[in-house]
A protein has these predicted regions:
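Alpha/beta enzyme core
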Residues: 4-16, 28-53, 59-74, 84-195, ...
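Short catalytic-loop micro-motif centered on adjacent basic/acidic residues
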Residues: 20-24, 79-80, 102, 199-202, ...
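Short, N-terminal intrinsically disordered low-complexity segments that are rich in Pro/Gly
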Residues: 20-27, 52-55, 255
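Active-site-adjacent C-terminal substructures of enzyme catalytic domains
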Residues: 180-182, 197, 254-259
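Short glycine/proline-rich, acidic loop/turn segments that cap or connect secondary-structure elements
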Residues: 227-247
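Extended, intrinsically disordered, low-complexity segments
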Residues: 240-274
Length: 274
């Protein structure tokens, strides 16, 4: 089926107390693994591409792959720009045929974040896309002093910008944790009560499963997974290389078990929040 937007999958997921997995992809294997997992679990999936890949043609190539995968599936598939850093990147996403984008203005002063996100929403909506915003910067490693979001900020931001989904800081971090994180589930619940749109949990990798389930039940309908997905890829490549001991094998055949390993991880994450 054709690619869909966040509004086609997230509101229903929130109403059901479930979430849709958003898997970061960078190449054919990761995109295929995400789709294989969705098919295996019979659930929608969000294929998202990190903003760095918009610096060259990789984001365009991934868009073509995602579109082909979606057209050959009966499942809803969203193609999403992850952590867009500028309005220009949102415009690139429009040009490349993405159906959704994130503008991450969380490092900006709050008023400036609102103003720039308003423009990002206008660009996205004019193109028939959805737009995810962010408040309360989500760091790359967990620290004692995480800048947490507040229900008041969330409500003000949503009302002022018209975003379709909102990422908030509740204690998660991108990457792998050096110690068990403090996930503020009560805060997550209060923020969800303050806004009517779906919320987004960034830093889903390595966050304890029980905490992910609790947060999803509050109204967080999009779960981002990147680091764990990529680590499985790297581990599988090393494992397969060791098996071959330098012997020749066609690359596509070599990559089959790597893709399967990624798909298994993705399927487990989908089951976790379904």
């Amino acid at each position: 089926m054709p690619l869909v937007t966040l509004n086609d999958v997230l509101p229903q997921a929130r109403a059901e107390g479930r979430a849709i997995c958003a898997l970061n992809v960078t190449n054919c294997e990761s995109a295929k693994a995400a789709m294989m997992a969705a098919e295996r679990e019979n659930r929608p999936v969000i294929i998202q591409v990190f903003q760095r890949l918009f610096g060259d043609d990789k984001a365009r190539y991934v868009a073509a792959m995602a579109r082909s995968l979606a057209e050959n599936s009966d499942l809803p598939v969203v193609l999403h720009l992850d952590h867009g850093q500028s309005l220009e990147q949102v415009k690139q996403a429009v040009e490349y045929g993405y159906t959704s984008a994130m503008f991450d203005g969380s490092k900006l002063p709050f008023d400036e974040n609102i103003a720039t996100t308003q423009e990002a929403v206008r660009i996205a909506h004019d193109a028939g896309m959805t737009l995810e915003g962010e408040i309360g910067h989500i760091p790359t490693t967990a620290t004692e002093d995480l800048p947490l979001s507040t229900p008041e900020e969330a409500a003000e931001f949503v009302a002022a910008t018209g975003v379709d989904a909102l990422a908030v800081a509740i204690g998660t971090a991108h990457g792998f944790y050096k110690k068990v994180p403090t996930i503020h589930v009560d805060l997550a619940r209060k923020i969800a009560e303050a806004v009517s749109i779906p919320l987004v949990l960034h830093g889903g990798s390595d966050t304890p499963d029980e905490k992910v389930r609790e947060v999803v039940s509050c109204g967080f309908a999009k779960l981002n997974i990147a680091s764990e997905f990529f680590q499985v890829f790297l581990d599988a490549v090393i494992r397969e290389s060791d098996k071959r001991a330098g012997a020749f094998i066609p690359i596509d055949i070599f990559m089959n078990p790597v893709t399967e390993a990624m798909s298994e991880l993705a399927a487990a994450k989908i089951r976790l929040v379904s």
